[in-house]
A protein has these predicted regions:
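Flexible interdomain linker/hinge and immediately adjacent N-terminus
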Residues: 1-19, 97-98
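Short, polar N-cap/turn motifs at the start of nucleic acid-interacting alpha helices
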Residues: 62-64, 146-166, 171
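Conserved tyrosine-mediated DNA breakage-rejoining catalytic core shared by Y-recombinases
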Residues: 55-91
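Basic, Lys/Arg- and aromatic-enriched nucleic-acid-binding interface segment
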Residues: 12-46
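Short, basic (Lys/Arg/His-rich) helix/loop patches that form interaction surfaces
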Residues: 23-30, 112-152
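Active-site/catalytic core of tyrosine-dependent DNA strand-transfer enzymes
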Residues: 14, 86-124
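DNA/chromatin major-groove-contacting recognition/catalytic segments
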Residues: 84, 88, 168-180
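Alpha-helix N-cap/helix-start motif at helix boundaries, enriched for small hydrophobics
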Residues: 39, 47, 51-56, 150
């Protein structure tokens, strides 16, 4: 049986998820809400893999002033790279006392699944940790970031992997933005 085509959420929908997380009332025993919000921002706005986001340490900023905003990241296969994290995201992380390894990927996945249900996001629109990374890649590719640069930002060993993200996003956008 063929799996139906999953569509990436639009930037507007991700802003809606962002607002939902910020504005919803606290539930009892909901200690990880802000941790998950920080993960949401790191995956969506910085393009980190969920494992990279969980282990992100804002104390590992590049020491040189000309590289302010670049943070050392230990990525897939224990490879190290520098990634840019916007000052606004660092401010949010600090305001919520972010520490590496406060949660796990399963809890974050469940958090996003619950947000999708509560926002009544249609089944054909995917909302998962890796989807946020794909949205980051898609947005930057469609806004002119060269593929080799995007490859480095995402930490892909092969540019073909990055090209698959972009190809998939273009196919989805053909469906989303059909000409009249």
């Amino acid at each position: 049986m063929n799996k139906p085509l999953q569509q990436l959420p639009s930037p507007q929908l991700l802003n809606q998820v962002n607002d939902y997380i910020i504005n919803r009332k606290n539930k009892r025993h909901e200690s990880k809400r802000w941790i998950h919000y920080c993960l949401f921002l790191l995956c969506w706005k910085a393009g980190l893999r969920v494992s990279e986001a969980i282990n992100f340490d804002y104390n590992l900023e590049h020491p040189a002033p000309e590289y302010k905003g670049l943070y050392l990241l230990r990525g897939k296969g224990s490879k190290e790279r520098y990634v840019y994290i916007a000052p606004q995201i660092i401010k949010v992380l600090k305001s919520h006392n972010w520490q590496p390894q406060q949660t796990n990927r399963i809890n974050f996945f469940e958090f996003l699944r619950e947000a999708k249900e509560n926002l009544h996001i249609p089944a054909h629109i995917e909302l998962a940790p890796h989807t946020l990374r794909r949205c980051f890649a898609t947005y930057n590719a469609l806004n002119g970031m060269p593929l080799p640069v995007l490859q480095n930002v995402l930490g892909h060993a092969n540019v073909r992997t990055t090209a698959l993200y972009v190809k998939a996003s273009r196919l989805e956008n053909l469906l989303k933005f059909k000409p009249i």
